[in-house]
Amino acid sequence: MKVIFFDAAGTLFHVKGSVGEVYLHYAEKYGVRRTDESLSALNAAFRRAFREAPPPVFAVSDPTEIKRCERLWWFDIVHNVFYRVGMFNRFDDYFEEVFHAFGGPAHWALYPETSGVLKELKDRGLELGIISNFDTRLFNVLRGLGIAELFDTVTISSLAHAAKPAPQIFRLALEKHAVDPEEAVHVGDSIGDDVEGARLARLHGVLIDRQRMDSGEHKPSALQVLTIRTLNELPQLISTL
């Protein structure tokens, strides 16, 4: 192997608490009451809205326009969430606060092993990259979490004009490293976006299954998916490929 690619959120780092908790934290000042029921409803509504959203791919190239499209994409998702659980006055002001809050490291945290594993892989002489459907705020998040300098490339959907699981975004990432698909691994927490997407582009796909999704239609073993529980298992797995 020459290059190891990673998904970002859910693979290298995670939201502190839950998205619903962050949404509710900022919504309280706008009169939204915090209860166990409202938190549960927000988390469920976010999962549904995010799942139903179109891919974050836009027919623009100007950096300012890309950021505008990203903001509108997220506005639709957050508006959809509160349309389901209860809208409130000054929603536009609220959205600006939440969108900005997720654009820095304050509400994100690295998984405990992330930095150590990335450094170990770099010490082996491997190149590292990110392939993510995150938006351009990712660059600031990576800097804030202290891992930006560990990556040789970062490929995101809004700049690549393609989103996982489409093979195009993987191929663009490969071109940046000038390697063949068989010389690269992609690690992520989604069977569809990450593992199947990587396979479509002929990379080695690895599922990081922190939640131990061992049952149901997406059972990793049933799909013969290379699976790890934490990033600590990745260096050994790579040695076998």
Functional labels for PLM-detected ranges:
Residues 1-4, 14, 37-40, 88-93, ...:
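Asp-based, Mg2+/Mn2+-dependent phosphohydrolase catalytic module
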Residues 1-112, 124:
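N-terminal helical cap/lid subdomain that shapes the substrate entry/recognition surface
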